[in-house]
Amino acid sequence: MSINEETSRLYQREPSVALPQPFAGLLNLALILVISEGVWYGLFSPAGPVTLYTPNVGLSLVITILMVIHWGVDVFDFWPFSRDFIMKTNRFLKGFILLSLSIGIAVLVMFGFYYNVIGRFGPIFFSGPQLIVSGGLGQYSQTAIENGCYAQIMMNTCVIFFTIMWVRSFGFSPWQLSNRLTKSLSVWLLGIFLGIIAFSVLFYPHIAYQFYPPQIFMAVPPWWSEWAMTQSGLFHFGWIVSALVLLYWTKMLWEGKPFSLIKTEWLSGTVMMVSVIVAGVIIMLIGNRIMDWYFGSEAFIGGNTTEQPAWRWNHVAEMALFMQAAAVVLYYYFDNWPVKGSLPVRALVRTVIAMAGGLLIAKLYYLLGPVFLGTVKGIGQENDTSNCWTVMFLILVTAHAVFFDGFPFKKKNVL
């Protein structure tokens, strides 16, 4: 995750710890891996004390935290904190305050807003506890909570995608001349509005039809089921996450190119929006073909786990997030290497590193996950997804780099 150039210039810090690369990057990566292991065991691991990885409860929580961090950094530009606070406050204290605030707001959104406002007085499917209270057929504790968190995951993913897509494509237009809070609130509300529309079309039909009996007067049958070979909204999750990763990469790895070559802002933004959506769908379809080759069979209705269409679409998202994990490590911890040479060459090398690094992270996750994370052995298991760990890792890296300024090994703030 990165932020707009204005914020980057505003909050750049002077060098503080002069460790040369790649030592600073390797030390920070080692530090964050140790922290991620501790956080995972303490909050998510089936062998730990809290066991949030059900998996949807844990995944819903980390996606909500990621959404709030995006709001605070990309949309609100650290409001209500001042420039002096960001620049002059002790790095550890500043990071603790910003991360704690982000987590606190996320918990309020998930357990306060979704569980006890929306789920209690509106669409009940956002709240597992309210589904249990309803006494509906099949809504026992585990199923109800997983269903409620699934709805939150998909809604929050839509909000993240359309918020970042607008910021990357159009900045704060058409409110760029307004004051800081006005333009931030406008983009924030627009991202939520577009996310609700997308959720209603792409995910709500699946949610309405996952209950028994199907809620035929509340939603149309999943309109994508014939050619997606599944009623699951994971079909859309696959291409949205892939497109979201491309949005990240346009800023992080490609430095705004090629879309910034179009000088007319509205045209550049429109081309970017259309391009990443189309590319996301193409990546998902290509990823499915690669899995046909890797697993030795095509997906089909009624297949085993790795042959289920819904699992395949979700696995595309999982692989995209593994590659995003490699990209943020390169961007934040290794100064977005390489930084010399022509931009096309730099962008190509960074992209190859992110893709290869993502494949390596995926291999290590499935190989070492059962030992260090308590996950189930094998690449395809029911009720298991790597997305929870990957999003948690993205949060930790981003918070460490942006909130804590890479403390203690990074030599400068990398906002």
Predicted regions and their residues:
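C-terminal transmembrane-bundle signature of multipass membrane proteins
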Residues: A30, V34-Y41, F235-L253, V276-M291, ...
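Membrane-proximal helix-loop-helix units in multi-pass membrane proteins
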Residues: F111-M155, I283-Y332, V339
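Alpha-helical transmembrane segments of polytopic membrane proteins
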Residues: G25, L52-I69, F96-I97, G138-V159, ...
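N-terminal signal-anchor module of multipass membrane proteins
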Residues: M1-G72, N156, V391-V397
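Transmembrane alpha-helical segments of multi-pass membrane proteins
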Residues: V17-A30, K88-L108, R180-I197, T264-I282, ...
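Membrane-helix interface motif
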Residues: V34-P49, L108-I132, I197-V220, I282-F300, ...
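Long, acidic/polar, low-complexity amphipathic helices and coiled-coil-like
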Residues: L101, L108-F125, L131-F237
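Cytoplasmic membrane-interface regions of multi-pass membrane proteins
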Residues: S2-V17, I69-G95, V159-S186, A208-P214, ...
